[in-house]
Amino acid sequence: MHLNIALWACGALLAVLLAWQQRKCWRLIWQLNGWRGVIQQPVLWLLLCINLHPNSILEKVSQYRVHFQRPLAVLVGTRVLLYIDDPAGMECVLNAPECLDKTFLQDGFFVRRGLLHARGQKWKLRRKQLNPAFSHNIVASFFDVFNSVGNQMVEQFQTQTNLHGQAVKFTAAEDLLSRAVLEVSCLTIMGTPTNFTQLDDAHIAHSYKRLLEISAVRVVKPWLQIRLLHRLLAPELYEESKKCAKLLEDFVGGIVRTKHRNWRLRDAVGGEKSGEDASNGWQRRIFIEQIFQLAANGEMTLEEIMDEAQSMVLVSFETVSNSIMLALLCLATNKGDCQRRLLAEIRALVPDVGQVGLEQLQQLRYLDAFVSESLRLLATVPMNLRHVSRDFRLAGRQHETIVPQNSIVVLDTFNMQRDERWWGANARQFDPQRFLDQEEEQLSKGHNDSGSGEKRRQRDRRHSYSFLPFSNGLRSCIGRRYGLFIMKVFLVKLITNFDFQSDFELEKLQFVENISLKFKNADDILLTIQPKKEST
């Protein structure tokens, strides 16, 4: 009898303590959605549990989100998972000092050290140290590298006879392109030629991609971040991740140690710390040469340099190569005059596509619109997660809304950029015209017909944060210019030399959240790549 009373008392005490810990979470749920938000919690828990896998989570979120009032708060233990898919909410979170850090979920990421996942003051310091390495002038100085590797990539496409006029899998073209982008990353980040454009017999590119896929699983299933549980619950995945990680650590570590040793030797004999002779002048500007100086000043260790190099190579290679492939997919499936207009503009403004210059890129307005539209429709990084370091007010709400400390904010860029509320009735259609300045100027003058009036209303309600290809706010992408320049240079060369066609329909894509956007049915996507008879 006494034992039962004691057990009941302990249970009641634990319930009270749990309720006290959750009080701010329930308050947020109430402030956002009232009783409806409270009643929906069991349904949300169930949906979250049964769809907890990268292969399904993005597709299911896209499917279910319209049935709930958003922003949406889900209670998870003593934390809140706050889902946001509107521009005002994005702006508030991305500019809030309380939301600067990544979440513990992202500790499952393969590269969890370095700028990519640094937190608090460490991130602020490291970002300040690394900003000069990605300045406009520095990135613009890499155009000779972009062009050289881009030309090699075109040669590889031309010599791959199995690609010419035949329907090939999307993944086959992706492999060739991703190796070329990895070559650029290794040259501009670490100053080391790797010849990946021709051959990657060590499977470095594949290992990077595979580790990202495994990282995505560890993010949505955080218990796999514990090594013992990962080894017990997913032994094959654990062994594969261990093997790939070792391969990439040896690859990057070997390059960094060799480059650092040579850098110190040059310094010892009185040579330039930054570099090489004039014939290899671009090497004086590479990322790793600049951060070696930070190490010499005692601001970084060699291990931290390796972390930063690994992080930068991975992010620059994966996001850029994926962005280019997504753009080519949009191009190939477009049945309008997009490809013709791009080719006409390039031939009119770029006399020699073998040496594309920055000034020429800046004149390619339709290419800009095409790139922006592909990044809008198929967001390279579909979702962004932020940790709330202390309570903060979610602005833009009619009533006061306080997001409690330790909440996890999910920023759904993918669905926001395809939402009819911000992009109109054709939000899920590929239409580069929407980004053209000329179209905006025509809309601003105003027309009396209903069509232009509807477009004008779309423009007026479009928030500046409704398009976030490289994030924004306090923690925006440090390599935005770098990524855009590579993407545009490569696209100019590919569009000028090849025709891309596909009978696949974008509406049939099955989306996968693998850190960057992937497709469950990628093997069903067939591309026809035909060399042009008259290449510029």
UniProtKB/Swiss-Prot annotation:
Subcellular location: Endoplasmic reticulum membrane; Microsome membrane
Regions of compositional bias (Basic and acidic residues) in chain numbering: 439-457
Main subcellular localisation: endoplasmic reticulum
Presence of the UniProt keyword Heme in the record: yes
One cellular-component annotation, GO: endoplasmic reticulum membrane
Source domain of life: Eukaryota
The protein's enzyme class: oxidoreductase
Residue span of region Disordered: 439-460
Entry keyword set: Endoplasmic reticulum, Heme, Iron, Membrane, Metal-binding, Microsome, Monooxygenase, Oxidoreductase
Cofactor(s) essential for the protein: heme
Keyword Cell inner membrane belongs to the record: no
One of the Pfam families matching this protein, by short name: p450
Binding site for heme: 477
One example GO MF annotation: heme binding
PROSITE patterns found in the cross-reference section: CYTOCHROME_P450 (PS00086)
Membrane topology field: Peripheral membrane protein
UniProt family annotation: Belongs to the cytochrome P450 family.
Function in brief: May be involved in the metabolism of insect hormones and in the breakdown of synthetic insecticides.
Protein name stated in the entry: Probable cytochrome P450 318a1
